Amino acid sequence: MRNQEEFVLTEGRSWCISSWLPSWCPTSLSHLIKSEDRILKPIKVKFTQGYVPISNGNYIWTLGFNEVECSSDLSITGVQQLKVPLVLLHGFGGGVGLWVKNLSAFAGEGRPVYALDMLGFGRSSRPTFGRDAKDAEEQFVQSLEDWRKAEGLEHMILLGHDLGGYVSTAYALKYPHRLKHLVLVEPWGFAARPNVQERWIPIWIKAFGAAMNPFNPLGPLRLAGPLGPLLLQLLRSDFKQKYASVFADDTVADYIYHVNAQTASGETAFKNMTIPYGWPQHPMMDQVEKISPSLPMTFIYGSRSSIEGQSGKAIQEMRPNSQTKIIVIQGAGHYVFADQSEDFNQAVLKICNNEC
């Protein structure tokens, strides 16, 4: 892992609308760094942070826990067994900072834990993605495999939330032998768009969707310019409540703003992977049967989430001779890991400990 200062000149300034209007959005790389430092401050265990170089001159921003001296278990034969690393992939519009309520718990038992800003998000490289959905998907997958090689991990427990769940599944399809367990938290992109969808969507929503189609999903946040931070606080005031046990101010909203007001990259890839209105071009339900039957899978849903949980049940039925579990966290919404962090942490630790 490289020093965090090494790529500052490579990243340059993040311009949110165009190179001739850099000051429209009140953000920059330094703002993002400061907001990330603030959101990670409550973590009391030691960790490293830095850029991991991958192919095509890109890099992945990574937090690492227990990398050098990880705890080990002694089996009844006296052979030392290292714990399998846990790797976390955030969802759309997220970043490493949103795991602040989970990282200390995950790393507390000595297990190597890594949290990544996915390619195109957070402090990772923001390259141009392919316009084809499959090309964009492959770029995400290859960046993860490049990162794994750079970190020297033979195997890992891969946990993905939302878009991170989709990318994790795509990775499992291509590199199943690298995974000990696939954990999908409220994963996006599994179900196909229902045929009845068009019938019940109001005309005004269809018109608005058509008008916004040329723009990236987070374009309005940038177009709002100096009002962007306030707009985010108003529209997503729920995040303050989700993290109220950790922060009394707008630390989380500030972090989310600076993560998403940077140059569009990962969100462009996401847009290229979708069809109206946010449904996947290539639903994972059509591909999941190809996943190795020997790979254990666990789906984690929130009981109050708007994400449909039928995909997990359907996949469980598809894999009658494979280990496929479904966990529902009571009282949690889409951001399960923030809404009910203690229950979520316990569930994930149990999965990890079963894999060593």
Feature roles, as predicted:
Residues 53-58, 65-80, 108, 114, ...:
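Active-site loop/oxyanion-hole signature of alpha/beta-hydrolase fold enzymes
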Residues 83, 91-95, 162:
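Active-site glycine-rich loops that stabilize anionic/oxyanionic intermediates
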Residues 2-45, 82-83, 134-142, 149-159, ...:
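Flexible "cap/lid" subdomain of the alpha/beta-hydrolase fold that forms the substrate-access gate
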Residues 91-101, 113:
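Serine-hydrolase catalytic-loop signature spanning alpha/beta hydrolases and amidase-signature enzymes
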